[in-house]
Amino acid sequence: MDSPSPPSIGSAARWRHRLDYLAAFVFLLCAGYIAVLVWVDHGNGTFSRLSEVWQSMALAIVPVSITYLFRYWRWHWLLRRKGHHVPVLPGLAGYLAGFALTATPGKAGELMRIRYFARMGIPAERTLGVFIFERASDLLVILSLSLLAASVFPTLGTLVALVLGFVCVLFGAAAWPALLNSLSRVSERLPGRWLRRLARFGLISALELRSCLDLRAFGQSMFTGFVAWGLTSAVFVSLCAGMGLQLNPMVALGIYPLAMLIGALSFVPGGVGTTELAIVLMLNRLGISTPDAIAVAVAARLVTLWYAIVVGAAAMLIAEFASREEAG
């Protein structure tokens, strides 16, 4: 398949319009989450239980923040090996800015990184290719860690088959030139200029993904993923210990990744609600009371998902301010 020129990303005004919609979606999601928490608190004492572990939650921010640095290092390394010079701090701000919209459907809001990395001379399809590779390798890491909690989720085998099947199809399609050539011919016959351009962009991204499918890139990505998700799992275990819950540490290490996997497969934006429910049900199977399980689930999500959104929003403001300074 020939490599056509990259499609236009759209004007700045269009980007701002889309970002406004995505930001409004995340804001409404946050408001709904708070409303549900207030409702759940009646009879469960969730807030009072959270107040008992606020110190553990504050300390948890440190390892969670370290995971962001590891993830950015992977992103920076993947782009650098493709010949791009990414300034460390502006690149970090652009990468973290994607977390502001991580609670959008399929984490698609994280693709706003295209906006910031395009300013550094990185084509949109390359950013998308790295994003897909990062997500796919993280999926394999999460799946591996989830096996530690197999005893509390009898149907894990089905999830394993689904995830492995998806990743194999994704990587197989990217690595199979004949399939991409066939898809390229089909895309040229699609009705509508917009649909053809979208399909063309997707195929170029698949070509970019193919360039990531070497042993060194896969090994580096998996190593970084295991460090990042291992730290996140350890944070969950520490929160359980802080609440005095007696759990097998090895099983507890697998609960949060497995809950994240279930949340992702639920197709609920950010896995909000479904991830928490999965944590509660798994802890219930281990003999933990529902009020305690709810408190742990909420605490874990506050220091992971919602903390990431706050960090992302701050990084987005920094990135936007920096771009205006350059324009001025």
Predicted features by range, described:
Residues M1-L96, V152-A264, D292, A297, ...:
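Predominantly cytoplasmic-facing regulatory/coupling regions of multi-pass membrane proteins
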Residues L143-P154:
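Transmembrane alpha-helix termini and helix-breaking/packing motifs in multi-pass membrane transporters
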Residues A97-G106, A241, P257-E276:
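Transmembrane alpha-helix interface/packing and boundary motifs in multi-pass membrane proteins
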Residues F117-P123, I255, L277-D292:
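Interfacial segments of multi-pass membrane proteins
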Residues R135-L140, R301-L305:
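Selective transmembrane-helix segments that form parts of the transport pathway or gating/packing helices
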Residues R80, L92-R119, L203:
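Extended non-transmembrane interhelical loops and adjacent amphipathic helices
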Residues V88-P90, A108-G109, I122-R135, I288-A299:
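Membrane-interface alpha-helices at helix entry/exit sites of multi-pass transporters
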